[in-house]
Regions:
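Glycine-rich phosphate-binding segment of PLP-dependent enzymes
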Residues: 24-88
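Short secondary-structure boundary micro-motifs
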Residues: 79, 93-94
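Conserved PLP-enzyme active-site core in the AAT-like
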Residues: 2-22, 31, 48-54, 61, ...
Length: 225
């Protein structure tokens, strides 16, 4: 279609020349940012493809299985791909995990025991975790099972309260949960670099503590995971 035909189509939809020119100027101003996003997306796409190649994914892995799912080659290989892409020792990728909150509950309840302490050094987590942890009373919460919850709020500028974090860690601190997304708060979303710095600080204080990152919506937005 020639330019005149395209202009007529826009006009028929009520999109004026001024709006089209404004959109073109905006896209031009953001071109470098769009190119940077495309570069990250392309890199991560290659990373996923390599993970599939390294684990020799083929048509056989897409065949249905029956029974209890023992030796489910497709499921096991999918988890191997996830582990490769995210550089993990292993992965748990199952349709039985119904939501992010469900996955976090599994991780928390699987690692914490009565008398252990859970620390959030980035303030209060998502509202959906309040009943899981026991911030709001709930049957079956971690609090009900004797897990103690502590939090250290970020400073107003979004920086970590390292002094407060160090003071909150003790011999009973078993797991530190770090929520990457700002959730419903106004703080900045955490970068991989900042999370790494925080974990290094915590590990220097208590090397055996478990650091769990809720990556919520953060997958593939950087070249590092």
């Amino acid at each position: 279609m020639d330019i005149n035909g395209m202009n007529q189509m826009y006009e028929s939809l009520g999109i004026s020349r001024e709006v089209r020119e404004f959109a073109a100027e905006t896209e031009k101003a953001l071109r470098e940012r769009f190119e940077a996003i495309d570069a990250v997306a392309e890199y991560n796409q290659m990373k996923v493809i390599k993970g599939m190649q390294d684990n020799r994914v083929s048509d056989i892995h897409f065949a249905a299985t029956t029974g209890y799912g023992y030796n489910d080659l497709g499921r096991d290989t999918l988890e191997d791909v996830y582990a490769s892409v995210f550089h993990g020792e292993s992965a748990l990728v199952r349709p039985q995990l119904m939501s992010g909150t469900h996955a976090l509950h599994v991780a928390l309840s699987g690692n914490l025991r009565p008398g252990d302490e859970l620390l959030s050094p980035v303030g209060k987590p998502y509202d959906t975790l309040e009943e899981v942890i026991g911030i709001r009373d709930s049957v079956g919460s971690l609090k009900e099972y004797g897990v103690v919850y502590r939090k250290v709020d970020l400073f107003e500028d979004g920086s970590f309260d390292y002094e407060g974090i160090a003071a909150a860690i003790n011999e009973r601190t078993k797991l530190v949960t770090i929520q990457r997304s700002k959730g419903y708060a106004t703080r900045p979303t955490l970068s991989v670099k900042r999370i790494g710095e925080l974990i290094s600080f915590i590990k220097n204080i208590k090397p055996d503590v478990i650091c769990m990152v809720d990556n919520c919506y953060g997958e593939f937005v950087e070249t590092l995971e």
